[in-house]
């Protein structure tokens, strides 16, 4: 609150969150504390101080799994989270919407695909795999590697948030989507190629992969329609 007043803040973009899905299965209380209680605390500050826009950064995972033959989801699709991380982000969204309606907090919600880019913390799959390859270590692959994700470059994500900051409408939800959907196995293969390692066949890829136990529940894919933005 003191920071908002001291610097006369008129816009808040709320990125802060615990985001490592694997950790949420074994330490879900921290995710509730950070993602839900933390968002609630920030909303209280914003309600008291007053801002022009409160942009809440959520995730495509709040929609839950999208079947292989399913259509890309629009912003009005049901929220059906399947892991503790996604549930905490969906719960945070409910607080944001409640404060928008009850206290006129000028909120906007953004749900994006997986973002990647330089200097990303290595709990995320692309920097994690890159770091392992730099060290000459094997890549850990959940299950059979057929799960797919869509990836969004950090610079493109920044452009989307800049657009929402300047043109986004209060009360709206915006998907920030990518069409770059690849399986985890294909991601392994692509990174091996970038490091000059053999990846022409499955057998060559598997030489650099160790299969690990899958998550208690692992959404096969996510797919959002970002045409609104």
Question: Which role does the model predict for each range below?
Answer:
Residues 1-115, 184:
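N-terminal Rossmann-like NAD(P)+-binding domain of SDR-like oxidoreductases, especially those catalyzing
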Residues 5, 44-48, 97-101, 131, ...:
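Short, well-ordered alpha-helices that flank and scaffold nucleotide-derived cofactor binding pockets
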Residues 26, 34-37, 76, 83, ...:
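Residue-level signal for the nucleotide or nucleotide-sugar donor/cofactor binding architecture
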Residues 41, 61, 67, 89, ...:
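Short, flexible micro-motifs
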Residues 69, 122-130:
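A glycine/serine/threonine-rich, flexible loop-to-helix segment
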Residues 133-229:
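C-terminal substrate-binding subdomain of Rossmann-fold SDR/epimerase-dehydratase oxidoreductases
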């Amino acid at each position: 609150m003191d920071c908002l007043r001291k610097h006369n803040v008129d816009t808040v973009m709320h990125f802060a969150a615990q985001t490592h899905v694997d950790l949420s299965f074994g330490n879900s209380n921290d995710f509730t504390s950070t993602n839900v209680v933390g968002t609630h605390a920030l909303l209280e500050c914003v309600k008291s101080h007053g801002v022009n826009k409160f942009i809440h950064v959520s995730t495509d995972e709040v929609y839950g799994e999208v079947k292989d033959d399913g259509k890309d989801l629009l912003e009005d699709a049901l929220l059906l989270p399947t892991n503790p991380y996604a549930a905490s982000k969906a719960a945070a969204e409910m607080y944001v919407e409640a404060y928008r309606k009850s206290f006129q907090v000028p909120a906007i919600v953004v749900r994006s695909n997986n973002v990647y880019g330089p200097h990303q913390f290595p709990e995320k799959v692309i920097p994690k795999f890159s770091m392992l390859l730099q060290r000459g270590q094997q890549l850990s692959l959940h299950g059979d590697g057929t799960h797919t994700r869509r990836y969004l470059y950090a610079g493109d994500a920044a452009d989307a948030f800049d657009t929402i900051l300047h043109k986004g409408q209060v009360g709206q939800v915006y998907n920030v989507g990518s069409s770059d959907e690849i399986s985890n196995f294909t991601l392994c293969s692509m990174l091996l190629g970038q490091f000059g390692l053999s990846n022409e066949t499955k057998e060559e890829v598997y030489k650099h992969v160790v299969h690990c136990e899958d998550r208690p529940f692992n959404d096969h894919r996510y797919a959002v329609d970002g045409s609104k933005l």
